[in-house]
Amino acid sequence: MFKSGFVTIIGRPNVGKSTLLNHIMGEKLSIVSSKPQTTRNNIQTILTGEEYQIVFVDTPGMHNPRHKLGEYMVKVAKESMNEVDVALFVTTPDVEVKRGDLHILEQLKSAKVPVFLVVNKIDETTEERLAATLKNYSEAFEFQEIIPISAQKGKNVDKLIELMVKHLNEGPKYYPDDMIIDKQERFIIAEIIREKALRFLSQEVPHGIAVEILQMKEENEKYKIEATIMCEKDSHKGIIIGKGGEMLKKISQSARKSAEKFLDKRVNMKIWVKVKKDWRDSPFVLGELGYKAPKK
């Protein structure tokens, strides 16, 4: 019997949702950064086995939105919970149930799907703290499955996959065997550039940046990519470019290497920086960048 279904991965920012997905898929498919709300779009990645196909919906973290982009991210996260077969609630072994977790669990109560408690980063805690965490979270919500893991080390990840398959129903193969993501290459390249910018800029520039791919074409076994990093302030533009252009050069070089690894071809990459004030509150700009503005 072939089983298939959709699984959403949800939790507070920085609990390791993207790291978990990356380990399962063996590819850097979801942007990984230490900054909250670094996943913006609803990305579907596909894991196909001999007797199953799991379509993962990697959603933005739940938070209180402060602009239209934030509203979009929260809307995507909430909608995904009503369209899946299993929800993985990922948290960390902090003993006490966090306020942010209580907010998400309250949302999950109305989802009417099996919810797994996935306690990540068990390699960074003690057995006593882990046991206390499992006890407190079990009392706060009725989970179908409880599994402690280390997404970074891969501990218990195979067991987690087995449990997901167990809860899926008989169903069709939604995607071809060799398909692992439902986004186009341009989207992935834009995410790679944005991830590098977030990583190198540290706390100097917040989340007010986006990446637009102006051109991406393949010629003679080589890709030519031109992109713009969009920011909200002139001061941010200066920081992104850096003294003598050093910061932008660092971002470009690192992004180019990752792009070459992803595309498996040589890449010629040029990146510019453009100021677009308050772009996160502009429905038009959000639409141009692929973010649909939430309906009122």
UniProtKB/Swiss-Prot annotation:
Residues 58-61 are annotated as: G3. One of its GO terms (cellular component) is plasma membrane. GO terms for molecular function: GTP binding; GTPase activity; ribosomal small subunit binding; small ribosomal subunit rRNA binding. Residues 120-123 are annotated as: G4. An essential GTPase that binds both GDP and GTP, with rapid nucleotide exchange. Plays a role in 16S rRNA processing and 30S ribosomal subunit biogenesis and possibly also in cell cycle regulation and energy metabolism. Monomer. This is GTPase Era. The gene is era.
